[in-house]
Amino acid sequence: MEQTYQYAWIIPFLPLPVPMLIGLGLLLFPTATKSLRRMWAFQSVLLLSIVMIFSINLSIQQINSSSVYQYVWSWIINNDFSLEFGYLIDPLTSIMSILITTVGILVLIYSDNYMSHDHGYLRFFAYMSFFSTSMLGLVTSSNLIQIYIFWELVGMCSYLLIGFWFTRPVAAKACQKAFVTNRVGDFGLLLGILGFYWITGSFEFRDLFQIFNNLISNNEVNFFFVTLCAVLLFGGAIAKSAQFPLHVWLPDAMEGPTPISALIRAATMVAAGIFLVARLMPLFIVIPHIMNFISLIGIITVFLGATLALAQKDIKRGLAYSTMSQLGYMMLALGMGSYRSALFHLITHAYSKALLFLGSGSVIHSMETLVGYCPEKSQNMVLMGGLTKHVPITKNSFLLGTLSLCGIPPLACFWSKDEILNDSWLYSPIFATIAWSTAGLTAFYMCRIYLLTFEGHLNVHFQNYSGKMNTPLYSISLWGKEGSKISNKNFPLVTLLKMKKNERTYFFSNKVYKIDENVRNQIQPFLSIPNFGNTKTSLYPYESDNTMLFPILILIIFTLFVGFLGIHFNQDVDILTKWLTPSINLLHKNSNNSIDWYEFSKDAVFSVSIASFGIFIAFFLYKPVYSSFQNLDLINSFVKISPKRIFYDKIKNAIYDWSYNRGYIDAFYGTFLTAGMRKLAEFTHFFDRRIIDGIPNGVGLMSFFVAEVIKSVGGGRISSYLFFYFSYVSIFLLIYYFVNL
């Protein structure tokens, strides 16, 4: 066992040869490297698989022995200062390593087909492998300096992948937005690290925790300064895990390829913030105010993310806000001191969300056969619908992921989210009420995404409905109800579909978009699949290739069974509790790790009832009678203009505007922060050029003109110079005489 731990340092470096060799190959032998590009995908999967096997072996040993291993190399600069580098293997490290490798392998296999048509195929796999290296280095770090180095590398890789299609202005802006937003958090993280080094004199986790606890117990620290440093450390996690108020980069990060959306949102970048807070939990728990602050940020993010997901049209953006909300649950659990529940939800959510993102990628891939490569159309749920019979495997997998995130047993997220919801009652009834209400919202918006995507009719080919219309112009709002007659065609928040009497209707035009040439002539992926690729444009979507479906099917297995890690069987300690021993739990300090099945069943029925209510509301608004457009006469019979209905419409539109406009937070930042910074920069530029540079330049210019005037008056004659000389001397003497008189 000791020998296994001694070689654990190799974990972060195994995937590293792939990006290095791809880079050298493209520089030295570009033609040969590109012609053998399938080989690089295979190598990426192979090396990450070796890391996965090694991580699983370490995890099994930790479950059996609850061991923690740390190895440190010391680089002594002088007698007073030395740098130490090493690796730390504990339950948190092994959990994160397994998450990163399992999700990473499946995303790489999926990407081989998804990115096969892209000219940046090799660049994509180089970024992905380096991303895995950076994240594995982060979770195995033994001190804050290493954490910060790999933290920045993880951020760099995510920026490169978000802006992967950098020729698209939207993707370039999204990359810039992610970079600037994370700079705020990363700067706070750096200041916090330096602050705690100033307090304790150490970057190593063990020494840091021990010294700091001694200082706290002896009351030898300034609590205000300590709290400030802790808030700065937490600021890095706020930005990385897209917590309020630094969450604004996450929805725009969907501009990157869909596979990287799955990896970033499931097991890498956004999970890094949760990992950091979990790693520093022994530091935070002795600072009560920071724990309260963490839980406050978590509960705000939980509710905000859910409300912003309610009316999104882009399928990936809706899932992004869902990720934000679920990360809020994890942060809430950490703030409450429920360490096990937070990590449990991190595990279950990672696989469920990866399943949903890869499923959405399969849908987008199939929609591109109809609308061409246009993210505004291929990702628009309003143009989807009726995909059940065209992509049945994707549909069923997406349904399982949806039900898991809704909290329906026995799927993965039910077990972990239920723990957090139950613990919230022990912490704060107000927080618990918000958390439970958000569980219903989660069920609503996830079911809404599923229904808009797969149920009803394929809206790209929507034919006119049968039945008599009472007015010549209708609009079907995103909420699923018939709207009033609309005259302003540019009103974006309500008008989603306009139908004229006895006319065939389409969202954009009545032509079928052709697939781009480089999409049709795809290069075969490294897994050989027979009869791959359609050579003709289809009028309907078709199921994705087996190479894309294989990772989805594996994620279904994880979604079905990974939740059983945290279930108590026969009153024994569950696997997750044994894995995390010793664990931190401020809410169950005297717990004997047994479970009261009556209490569990009562809480489970309550949570499932709330989720079922959200699902029912979503079905009521989006299922058949509204979404199929087959019986508008029945709808019209229920629609009565009354003051009560007008009031409800106002509430509905206000909620819709709030959600669709991202809570106006982006607009606030754009108006006050971005515009203010631009004006400040313009003023600074003006002050620098006109005032700072203007004064010496003005003095020099004035001296030049005075010299020119004097030179012209003198005329070049010595007698004139002598005359002016004696005149100025006389004037000076007179002034001096009268001043001293």
Curated annotation (Swiss-Prot):
NADP listed as a keyword: yes
GO cellular component, one term: chloroplast thylakoid membrane
Entry membrane topology: Multi-pass membrane protein
InterPro entries (alphabetical): NADH_UbQ_OxRdtase_chlpt_su5_C, NADHpl_OxRdtase_5_subgr, ND/Mrp_TM, NU5C-like, Proton_antipo_N
Transmembrane residue ranges: 9-29, 40-60, 89-109, 125-145, 147-167, 185-205, 219-239, 258-278, 283-303, 327-347, 354-374, 396-416, 425-445, 549-569, 605-625, 721-741
One annotated GO molecular function: quinone binding
Key words of the record: Chloroplast, Membrane, NAD, NADP, Plastid, Plastoquinone, Quinone, Thylakoid, Translocase, Transmembrane, Transmembrane helix, Transport
Predominant location category: plastid
Reaction(s) catalysed (UniProt annotation): a plastoquinone + NADH + (n+1) H(+)(in) = a plastoquinol + NAD(+) + n H(+)(out); a plastoquinone + NADPH + (n+1) H(+)(in) = a plastoquinol + NADP(+) + n H(+)(out)
Enzyme Commission number(s) of this protein: 7.1.1.-
GO biological process: ATP synthesis coupled electron transport; electron transport coupled proton transport
Function comment: NDH shuttles electrons from NAD(P)H:plastoquinone, via FMN and iron-sulfur (Fe-S) centers, to quinones in the photosynthetic chain and possibly in a chloroplast respiratory chain. The immediate electron acceptor for the enzyme in this species is believed to be plastoquinone. Couples the redox reaction to proton translocation, and thus conserves the redox energy in a proton gradient.
Subunit-level organization: NDH is composed of at least 16 different subunits, 5 of which are encoded in the nucleus.
NCBIfam families given in the database record: NDH_I_L, PRK06590.1
Protein name stated in the entry: NAD(P)H-quinone oxidoreductase subunit 5, chloroplastic
Organism (species): Pentatrichia integra (Rock-climbing daisy)
Lineage: Eukaryota, Viridiplantae, Streptophyta, Embryophyta, Tracheophyta
